[in-house]
Amino acid sequence: MAELEKLAAARLEKEASNNTVNPVREVSEDDVKDVSGETTVVTTSISEGANESLSKKEDEPALIGSNVPEELEGNSLEVQSAITTDLEKVSSTPTPSNAEKESPEATEVRIVEEGKLEKADPSVVNEELSKEILEDPEVVPSPAKMYTALKAVDGDMPVLKSENGNDGDTDANTADEDNENDEDDVDEDEDEDDADMDTAKALAELAMTAGKSGNPAFSGTKPSMGAAGPSLPSLPQRPAVRKPIAATASDSPGRNTQRPNGALSTQITSTTDESASSDAAEGDETREKLQNIRVKFLRLAHRLGQSPQNVVVAQVLYRLGLAESLRGGSAPNRSGAFSFDRANALAEEQEAANQEEELDFACTILVLGKTGVGKSSTINSIFDERKSVTSAFKPSTNKVQEVIGTVHGIKVRVIDTPGLLPSVADQQHNERIMGQVKKYIKKASPDIVLYFDRLDMQSRDFGDLPLLRTITDLFGAAVWFNAIVVLTHASSAPPDGPNGVPLSYEMFVAQRSHVVQQTIRQAAGDMRLMNPVSLVENHPACRTNRTGQRVLPNGQIWKPQLLLLCFASKILAEANSLLKLQETTAPGRPFGQRSRVPPLPFLLSSLLQSRAQLKLPDEQAGESDESDDDEEEEDSDADDYDELPPFRPLSKEELEDLTKEQREDYMEELADRERMFQKKQYREEIRRRKEAKKRQAQMSKEELAEAEEAEDEAGNAAAVPVPMPDMALPPSFDSDNPTHRYRYLETANQWLVRPVLETHGWDHDAGYDGFNVEKMFVVKEKIPASVSGQVTKDKKEAQVNFEAAASLRHGEGKVTLTGFDVQTIGKDLAYTVRAETRFNNFKRNKTTAGVTATYLNDTIAAGVKLEDRVLIGKRVKLVVNGGVLTGKGDKAYGGSLEATLRGKEYPLSRTLSTLGLSVMDWHGDLAIGGNLQSQFMVGKTMMVGRANLNNRGSGQVSIRASSSEQLQMVLIGIVPILRSLINCRFGFGGQSQQ
């Protein structure tokens, strides 16, 4: 072996002196395989810079034969002969030209058992090496594979040592591998899209490094194993000498440039992600914080004596991982696969180093329950000392108090409350106590709520439902979303079952738990709730284990289990706040109450409705909502009625003497004169109204007061209460008609109170389920205002509607309408403040702008609207409006278009046609609807037709006819009756029943 070393050294010196291109070949002890015959890969590089690398390695000791095992010495000659033959072939090759120098290639040579040489395929080599690591049945999968998502070779990463303490190869092997890594980096820059090939290369390099580490525990490319589990192989380091910045900037990616000395320059790519965005950095920070939460929870479980395989621990860890993936979409190959192992290892390491250290964790617990169930005794059992006074004969806790202590180095803060009474007559007492609790917890919201009850209570009904509903009404339904049911006296003997045999303990606990959980669901109004149940036994005679911990009949140690449930809830709340999966709890709102998004489409529809402006009492006579428009369209034609010739009405006897044609002509003439007379009266009313406005504008306040006094002195007749007509009640099975009970009078009082009739009510019911109150008044003789309210209550629900409005005129053609509304939406009251201003742009154009704000369930929804009304001629009116409403980060957009075509003699003829189109966009869901309505006279019959259709394909068509002469129209009602009889006889569709 010494002679072989001398020959190899002499040949290398000769090649260096001749300055020729020779392959650099260094063989380590791992290049020689054992008798198992496994394939070994030897990489040989051809480079013009070989002289420099050789000159640096002349002083290094030879590796061949230095640590060769005895059983391999016989095969060394064969291996050395093959290497020498290959070197001679390479040295005999002519010197490459400049063109060939610009595109050098690395030749990989495989030495097989027989000593022959063959060219190796890089993809096959990488595949075999990766399979050798991952598929070996004796090797436990190592976390090293997780590094493939990152850059495999990084100069900033520390070299991980193998189990025997070796740093990897010698400096010669490290330099050789650095050249190979540089060439690999150039290839990666040339083809960045081939991510799979890069990952395979990184894995192969890690495997080759592990094989060259000299670890006797594995042959070739297997990572080291030890008592602590698999360890990562040593990562190859980057070369110490880097390419100058100027040279790096001048070289284009994927193209080789020639240095002045003729050596080939290699493009070196940075392995650190310098162009990482702020989102990625924030995601890494979030994952790190979440990992700290995992470590904290595992430390909590370890201190409570619970293993990671505990059901509660495993479920919490699973939820943390699921929440992380949903929030950030983190790749499982980066943190998901081994985050638990790392967290568990860190938790065990920190606990081993600091067992007595107090954790940076505190939990606040609120206890609620009936008196005498054992709340204070449980608090004493948790802290293993007397923190609260207890008594077996009377309530011992008289006020809300706070108990603070440490359990296994964990700070626990318990809010002890007085006991509640289950009787319905004691609800006032319970409300007073819970009012104190609600005031106390405003300072610091509790993390978990423990509701106490006894396991040995033999009640299978909902006797505690009034008490639980009182808790729900005061704290909200969200108090049960983060509550744990605690059943005390858990060592009680199970009662006898229906067959006289005692129930099993599991069945006893399940039945009692089901009753309490079902009662909570009824009180919260959510049948999906599933509160966890924990059993507690505080009696001194309770069975204990060797460590003195109290054990239940089912073998469970109740104290760690109860604390683990409390801590798990706090941990999940911290993770939820970190990942922002749900909206955070607002200050002063305990138990994580979440405000609901208001019904924006409903509120937007109410905002877009056109509202009539209020007017003074002397302006309201004979006016309608469209009176302002009618005032501006006074007909300029002469009054045709005064120019008509005299007309004498005929008596009944004279009509009978006329023929049919004469009678028809007479009726037409009479109808025309009646129509023209009504038109004359309508014009006179408009003219009188305009004159009154002008006169009122010219008169001063004193003159108005004198005019009112003169009217009072004129001796107007006093208003006499007049009974209002009875309302038409629906048919009833009752013998007597109860209308006499609800008669009311129309008095001179400004307050108008009327009953509200529900025509579609219950049988054997009067039909009156509410009342309505209205009042119109004037503020400071200029501002008309109105107040109206309605309250309805039936057997299921109650509704309240209140509206207050006032109009303020501030200039010619400018009116502002303000209002305050209260209405019932679901089970909540919505308070709305609105204001809109209408002004005249032109003679036939009016524009309205309005704002609104609605307060509903601790949420404010605000919106704006814009409306424009245009008159085209005397018959066509266009109304266009649009608005937007926002609340709780949500928005709804809407608008409508309405075109109205009036008859020639409207409003006398009552001929009117309306075409409407509405659009609303909410959450990207576009709703489009159209409706058409037309009413006209056919002789003396009023015909009304309606049709509507939306973009979802649903619509409705209705036709209504009303006449006082065509009584035969009543026969149409026979059609549905006949259809029902036919269906009952022959079945639906006319088919006979089988």
From Swiss-Prot:
Q: Where are the annotated segments for G1?
A: 369-376
Cystine pairings recorded for this chain: none
Identify the keywords attached in UniProt to this record, alphabetized: Chloroplast, GTP-binding, Hydrolase, Magnesium, Membrane, Metal-binding, Nucleotide-binding, Plastid, Plastid outer membrane, Protein transport, Transmembrane, Transmembrane helix, Transport
- Where exactly are the transmembrane stretches of this chain? 969-989
Gene Ontology molecular functions: GTP binding; GTPase activity; metal ion binding
Is Transcription regulation included in the keywords of this UniProt record? no
A family per Pfam: AIG1
AIG1-type G domain residues are: 360-589
Query: What's the cofactor?
Result: Mg(2+)
Q: Where in the cell is it found?
A: Plastid, Chloroplast outer membrane
Write down the superkingdom of origin. Eukaryota
Please report the record's description of how this protein sits within the membrane.
Single-pass membrane protein
Task: Keyword check for Thylakoid, yes or no.
Answer: no
> Region G5: start and end of each range?
537-539
Q: Where is this region: Disordered?
A: 14-61, 84-124, 152-287, 616-659, 691-716
Its GO CC terms are: chloroplast outer membrane
Where is composition skewed (Basic and acidic residues) in this entry? 99-121, 650-659
Q: Where are the compositionally biased (Polar residues) regions?
A: 37-53, 84-98, 249-268
- Stretches with biased composition (Low complexity): 269-280
For biological process, the GO terms are:
protein targeting to chloroplast; protein transport
**Skewed-composition ranges (Acidic residues):** 166-197, 620-643, 705-714
Cofactor binding comment, as recorded: Binds 1 Mg(2+) ion by subunit.
The EC number of this protein is 3.6.5.-
Family from the record: Belongs to the TRAFAC class TrmE-Era-EngA-EngB-Septin-like GTPase superfamily. AIG1/Toc34/Toc159-like paraseptin GTPase family. TOC159 subfamily.
Protein function: GTPase involved in protein precursor import into chloroplasts. Seems to recognize chloroplast-destined precursor proteins and regulate their presentation to the translocation channel through GTP hydrolysis. Probably specialized in the import of nuclear encoded non-photosynthetic preproteins from the cytoplasm to the chloroplast.
Instruction: Please report the name of this protein according to its UniProt entry.
Output: Translocase of chloroplast 108, chloroplastic
Record organism: Physcomitrium patens (Spreading-leaved earth moss)
